[in-house]
Amino acid sequence: MTELAQQKCQPYQSGSSPITAEEITALQAKIPDWNLLEYEGIPRLQKLYKFANFQGAIAFTNAVGEAAEKEGHHPALLTEWGKVTVSWWTHDVGGLHQNDFIMAARTDDIYRQQNA
């Protein structure tokens, strides 16, 4: 498990601001396989994971969902045959928060554990 994945998600105040561009750059260096994109004017992290079949994709989706429930921070998940697209951003801040990077790192760990 990476150092970033070991961190706990931190509570944030409603109305808080997203993290800065400098913070995004520093945190993204810790999860270089994630894409930083903007959708409907909101920056988010996104990554596509591939699987041999639908069962693997569903198992991964459920594991990410369980991790999200434990932290109270939830992604957008698109599950298809042989692939899952995961997107992290913080709705309440209208952009990215450190929690998104923590959960992206945990998502990578879940994938590695299931595909070891």
From Swiss-Prot:
Keyword check for Protease, yes or no. no
Please verify whether the record's keywords include Lipid biosynthesis: no
Alphabetically sorted, this entry's keywords are: Lyase
Annotated GO MF terms: 4-alpha-hydroxytetrahydrobiopterin dehydratase activity
Q: Which family does it belong to?
A: Belongs to the pterin-4-alpha-carbinolamine dehydratase family.
Instruction: Read off the HAMAP family from this record.
Output: Pterin_4_alpha
Q: What is this protein called?
A: Putative pterin-4-alpha-carbinolamine dehydratase
The record lists the organism as: Microcystis aeruginosa (strain NIES-843 / IAM M-2473)
